[in-house]
Regions:
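Intrinsic disorder in cytosolic terminal tails and internal cytosolic loops
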Residues: 2-55, 473-493
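C-terminal transmembrane bundle of multi-pass solute transporters/carriers
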Residues: 3, 38, 96, 108-112, ...
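Flexible cytoplasmic inter-helical loops of multi-pass small-molecule transporters
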Residues: 41-44, 244-268, 480-490
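C-terminal membrane-cytosol helix-exit motif in multi-pass small-molecule transporters
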Residues: 140-141, 173, 177, 234-253, ...
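Helix-loop-helix hairpin linking two adjacent transmembrane segments in secondary transporters
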Residues: 153-159, 205-243
């Protein structure tokens, strides 16, 4: 359900020798890539000379601190744009298009971003991402100053979409940085500590989400979009300046002589995924879940804004996002255990039950409590998926695999977001206000302003619950569990 609120991805070693081979349990060299029976997924081999230790962990913590500033900035402006767009246009369709467009661009750019990450130093990729985001936000500021308010808020005109579009692009480029950060966890953190490192990243993202949820709503309600843009530009510049002072111990990725790497290396990503039995099925399962998750993405804010003022809704999101911090702290403290795939499935069961019950009646504390629980379990799911990929996929191909997985999984959300917006706006919401709608479904969803949206949430939760039950009894689930255990590095590493 990572795509549900675009809670962007959590961040996910064995010691590599000069020949890029690890030692076995008895100190003997492991089979090389060309040896019979060799399987690339038996360890996420690092480049020669890179050994996780105190220095690399310090670099990881510095990157993590910078991620906090960057995530605060991007989330702050993106949340503010969503609130501003709905309040000014009063259109569920407009907010659905914005959310769907964001996820669509993330999906289209995933493979390209992943290829860039694998073929360049991770620090350089992060710097480029932050710089592009800064330029986009500055362009949005220029548009805000150039055009009058009545043209900016007319969602039927080009100015509104140009203004929202450049902010959207600035947020999309952040996913390039997130893919790079996922691979730096593999690079900088020893294998046995990666699940806890992913929990730390979840904690940081939860803190960022909590801060921005509160201040985005307050900023739009009290300061307006102009000051909000100015603050976002300043924070982005601050994050970029800090990032330039960080050093990541890494080497330039090797390149084939005379060969130009493809911009979209789909073949390399698919090859790495096929090398791990069951991994493709996990990605397809996440894709289906995100198809259902697009409903949450499209309708969670409109439903919340029917129960709360924009200022109150921002505070509710800020308070409930503390659950995201708690979930990340739990993983950082206790890890995921020996079977992260099982943890991932159980979390999806909880998410499905939340979708069924948290809008069953139009009661603010039920909705807020459901969001709080949702925030608690999402970091566990994110950390589980990241930890699995970081162990079973070779480091040299992780960027492409993360990017490909992002593209495939996230591509489902815009489909449902684009579909459910018009269906809710012009179909279910008006229908549930009629006597016929109340007579047919009133026993289930009760009475209120947004019973049509509640009906969509309930149906989506039931669909997800069935999908998880089927997945947990399927052969690919058992195969991938074995693949993860077989990929465990020997104790000597």
């Amino acid at each position: 359900m990572s795509a549900t609120t675009d809670l962007t991805t959590d961040l996910s070693v064995t010691t590599a020798s000069v020949s890029a081979m690890t030692e076995g349990p008895e100190g003997s060299p492991a089979d090389g890539p060309d040896a019979p029976g060799h399987s690339e997924h038996h360890a996420a081999r690092l480049p020669p000379g890179i050994t996780p230790g105190p220095q690399t962990l310090r670099a990881f913590r510095a990157v993590l601190a910078n991620t906090l500033v960057a995530n605060v900035t991007t989330s702050y402006l993106w949340f503010a744009l969503t609130f501003w767009a709905y309040l000014e246009t009063k259109s569920v369709l407009a907010t659905s298009i914005l959310g769907g467009s964001y996820m669509l661009l993330i999906a289209v750019g995933g493979i390209f971003f992943g290829t860039l990450v694998d073929h360049h130093r991770k620090h350089a990729v992060m710097v480029a991402s932050s710089a592009i985001t800064l330029v986009m936000f500055m362009l949005a500021g220029a548009l805000y100053l150039l055009f009058p308010t009545q043209r900016l808020v007319d969602w039927n005109g080009p100015v509104f979409w140009a203004f929202a579009g450049v902010i959207l692009l600035g947020g999309v480029v952040e996913s390039l940085r997130n893919i790079a950060l996922s691979t730096t966890v593999t690079l900088l953190v020893p294998d046995g500590q990666r699940d806890k490192a992913n929990g730390q990243v979840g904690t940081v993202q939860g803190i960022a989400f909590m801060i921005t949820s509160v201040f985005s709503g307050l900023s739009i309600g009290l300061l307006g979009m102009g000051w909000t843009l100015g603050l976002a530009i300043g924070l982005t510049a601050l994050a970029l300046g800090h990032l330039l002072t960080i050093t990541i111990p890494e080497q330039r990725p090797p390149r084939d002589e005379g060969a130009r790497p493809p911009a979209f290396d789909i073949r390399g990503a698919i090859g790495a995924i096929r090398a791990v039995p069951g991994l493709g099925a996990l990605i397809l399962f996440s894709c289906f879940n995100n198809l259902v998750g697009g409903v949450y993405m499209a309708l969670m804010d409109p439903y919340g804004l029917t129960l709360f003022s924009v200022e109150s809704w921002g505070i509710v999101l800020g308070v409930t996002s503390f659950g995201f911090v708690l979930g990340g702290l739990w993983v950082a403290r206790f890890g995921l255990g020996e079977k992260p795939l099982r943890s991932l499935m159980l979390v999806n069961v909880v998410v499905a039950l939340i979708g069924i019950f948290f809008t069953v009646r139009e009661v603010w504390w039920v909705y807020a409590g459901g969001i709080l629980l949702f925030m608690c379990v999402i970091p566990i799911a994110e950390a589980a998926e990241q930890t699995i990929l970081q162990r079973v996929v070779p480091f040299a191909k992780q960027g492409r695999v993360f990017g490909f997985a992002q593209s495939v999984e996230v591509a489902a959300s815009p489909v449902s977001a684009f579909l459910i917006g018009p269906i809710a706006q012009y179909g279910l919401i008006p229908y549930m206000k009629t006597a016929e709608g109340q007579e047919r479904f009133g026993w289930l969803v009760g009475a209120g302003q947004a019973r049509g949206i509640a009906l969509v949430f309930i149906a989506s939760g039931l669909l997800m619950l069935v999908a998880v039950a089927v997945a947990m009894i399927s052969p690919p689930y058992r195969v991938l569990s074995r693949s993860y255990q077989q990929a465990e590095p020997p104790p000597a590493s």
